[in-house]
Amino acid sequence: MKKYDIKTTDKETLRKWFYLMTLGRAIDEKAPSYLLQSLGWSYHAPYAGHDGIQLAMGQVFDKDTDFLFPYYRDMLTVLSAGMTAEEIILNGISKATDLTSGGRHMSNHFSKMEWHIENVSSATATHDLHAAGVARAMVYYGQKGVAITSHGESAASEGYVYEAINGASNERLPVIFVFQDNGYGISVPKKDQTANRKVADNFSGFKNLRIIHCNGKDVFDSMNAMTEAKEYAIANRTPVIVQANCVRIGSHSNSDKHTLYRDENELTYVKSADPLYKFHRMLIRYGRFTEEELKEIADLAAKDLKAANRKAMAAPDPDPSTVKDYVLPEPYQPQKYKEGVQNEEGEKETLVTAINKTLKAEFRHNPDTFIWGQDVANKEKGGVFNITKGMQQEFGIERVFNAPIAEDYIVGTANGMCRFDPKIHVVIEGAEFADYFWPAVEQYVECTHEYWRSNGQFTPNITLRLASGGYIGGGLYHSQTIEGALTSLPGARIVYPSFADDAAGLLRTSMRSKGFTLYL
C-alpha cells in the first residue's frame, strides 16, 4: 500500500516539501554566481532533475538512528535531512565554519557529522564500503536504523560498489544503496557503462537483496520507495537497492558543457521533465494549494536564502597557518618502557607468538576491538602464519571473523565501522601477503586523509596488519616490501618491528592509539 499521494498527504507536509524543493533549487541556481565573483564554489554539480529522490532520502533519514553518505550532487538530500542553507553555503565558499571540513574539502561535499551525515570522498561511491561497515556496527550494537548511501548509476561500474553490495548481502546488513540514474557519467552515456537499461538489474541475482525501482523525478513515488526500503531493511536486516530514474537538466558540473554531447531534443525533454515544475503544477491541479499560497512559500525561501547568504559571507576564512593541523592524532603514550628499552627477562618468544599474545591481551582490555581479514578465523588456522590462532574461540565470531577476498572491502568496512563510535578499534589483515594489498590502495588513501579532510572530526582507528618482506624467497608475490610506495602519503603511521618485543609493543600502542596505522 502506498503511503504518500497527492490527495491524502497532509497539507503541512506538502508545504514543507515544496519549501525545501524551492529553497534547494534556489541555492543550486545561485551556486555558480559565487565562482563568477571569485568567492568560491569552485566545484558545483547541479542536482536539478533529481529532486524527488533527494527530497525523499532526506525525509526518511533519522539523525538519531541512521547514517547518511551523500555524494557531491546531493545538495537537496542534505537540505531535506536538516542542514540549513547557511551550512550549505559555508561549504560551497569554503569558510572556516564549514561543518564539513572547515574549508578543507572540495565544495559541494556536504556533511554534518554530529548528525551522522558523513564526510565522504570525491571519488564517487567509495562511501558504499563505509556504509556497509557502519551498518555492521549497527547490527553488532543493536541499533535499529539504516545506512543510506547515494551516488549516480555510472558509479555502479566501480568494483568497490560490487564489493559493498556483495558484502552487505552476505552479512545481511541494513544498507540502502540509492542509484540516482540520470543516464550519464559526465558525458559517457549509460549504454557505454552497462548492458542493462536499469543498472540495479546487474545485482538481481544476489541473495538477501531487495531491489526497488522508482521515478526519482516524482516526490510521491520516491517517498514511497524510500519508506518501503527503510522499513524492509530494518525488518529483514538486509540491504536494499533503490534505483531512481532521474534526469540531469544541466551539465555534469561547472567544468562541463553538455551541449557538446546532447542534442536539442534531449535538452528540451529534460527541461520539460523538471520535478519542481511538475510538483508545482500538481499541487495546483489537485487543489491542494493556490498560486498565491505557493508564491508565499517561494518568497519565504528566497528571503531565507538571502539571510543565509549574508551570514555565510560574513563568516571567517580558514587560517592558512592551520593547513598542517589534523594530519595525525597524537598516539597513545605507553605507561611502561617509555624509552623503548626493557630488560630481557623471562622466556624468549617468537615474533608470531608475541603478536598473537598481544592481540588476545588487547581484545581482553578493550571489548570494542574487532579483527577480520583473509584466513583469520578457520577452526585452528589463524591466518597464513597463525597470527590469530585461538582468537575466534575465545572472543567469538562477532569480533573475529573472515572477510571475502576483497581487499578494498576489508579496509573500507573497517573505516565505516569506526564511524559508529570512536571507542571502536579495528585490526585488519589487509591481504594474505603485503604483495596482494594493491587493490585496497584506494581505501588506504581514504583512511590517510579522513582526519585532515574532516578538520579533526573523524579518524579511523585502524591497525592495518600485513605480512611483508617474507624470508621464504617467494619472488614477486610473496616477498615484496611495500612501505616505500606508501610512505609518501601523509596521514598514516607506518611501523615495521624487527624483534618480538618490538612487535608486541608497537602492536599494543597501535591498537590503543587514535588514527590509522600500517603495521608491517
What spans do the regions from the language model cover?
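Thiamine diphosphate
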Residues: 55, 115-182, 216-232, 378-458, ...
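Cofactor-binding active-site loop characterized by glycine-rich and histidine/acidic residues
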Residues: 29-173, 189-207, 476-477
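General beta-strand structural signal in soluble alpha/beta enzymes
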Residues: 46, 68-71, 100-102, 132, ...
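Short coil/turn connectors at secondary-structure junctions
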Residues: 14-18, 39-41, 62-67, 84-89, ...
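Conserved acidic/glycine
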Residues: 1-53, 59-60, 244, 249-398, ...
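Gly-rich Lys/Arg/Thr-decorated short loops/hinges at beta-loop-alpha junctions or inter-strand turns
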Residues: 36-39, 107-117, 144-147, 180-184, ...
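Glycine-rich ThDP/TPP pyrophosphate-binding loop and its adjacent helix/strand module
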Residues: 116-306, 310, 314, 487-520
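Short acidic, glycine/serine/threonine-rich loops at helix termini
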Residues: 79-84, 159-163, 187-192, 224, ...
